[in-house]
């Protein structure tokens, strides 16, 4: 495990539709408890707290619209549902017109992104050590995906679904946020190379080696198959 340099690093997250069904939206509805600012080209509009803004691709006067809170409050996208809840986002929302559809990119500090990942990937009531380990794993995974840049056609680095790491499926949690803060900047490396920290929710107790599942002939030494055993004699 290594400590990354202190830099104000950000990540760009492509937000999918309800049920993570599609990468592009028919319309986008945004609101916030506090005032927020909408910028389209040279024009700028201020929306009051509680006001809902509805944007459709056909109505967009610019190819890109950016939305940010005037008071660093979270932005809710009411046109998206995650389970029974409406997700809320830190940072900036960037809406990009693509024909009759809209792409939504949430740009925010990477550490704050992890606040939205941890409780979506691991129950926040798990032990502190487990949450800290997951925070390091999630940070390393995000950094690796930024390097891979597989979503460059969307001008994003990850999306919010299981294709990457689930993000904002569950609300932020104080315990999970603390685990992120306690491990700030820590990533997993193999030698001087950032490691690929794949993880999964369900296991039968046996993992397999990387060359069997990652569609590559290159063996990754630290991703070797293991039998996971637990002593339950006590």
Predicted regions and their residues:
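Conserved, single-site charged/polar hotspot
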Residues: 1-234
């Amino acid at each position: 495990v290594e400590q990354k340099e202190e830099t104000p690093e950000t990540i760009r997250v492509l937000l999918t539709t309800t049920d993570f069904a599609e990468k592009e939206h028919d319309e986008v509805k945004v609101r916030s408890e506090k005032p927020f600012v909408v910028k389209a080209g040279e024009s700028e509009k201020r929306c009051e707290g509680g006001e809902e803004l509805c944007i459709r691709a056909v109505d967009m006067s610019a190819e890109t619209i950016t939305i940010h809170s005037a008071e660093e409050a979270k932005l809710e996208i009411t046109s998206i549902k995650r389970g029974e809840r409406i997700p809320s986002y830190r940072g900036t929302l960037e809406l990009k017109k693509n024909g009759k559809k809209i792409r939504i990119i949430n740009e925010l500090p990477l550490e704050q992104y992890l606040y939205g990942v941890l409780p979506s990937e691991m129950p926040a009531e798990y032990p502190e050590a487990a949450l800290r380990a997951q925070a390091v794993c999630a940070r390393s995974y995000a950094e690796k995906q930024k390097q891979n840049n597989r979503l460059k056609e969307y001008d994003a680095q990850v999306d919010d679904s299981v294709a990457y790491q689930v993000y904002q499926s569950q609300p932020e949690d104080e315990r999970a946020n603390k685990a992120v803060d306690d491990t700030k900047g820590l990533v997993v490396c193999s030698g001087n190379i950032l490691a690929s920290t794949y993880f999964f929710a369900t296991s039968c107790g046996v993992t397999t080696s990387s060359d069997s599942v990652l569609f590559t002939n290159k063996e990754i030494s630290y991703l070797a198959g293991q039998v996971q055993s637990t002593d339950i004699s006590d």
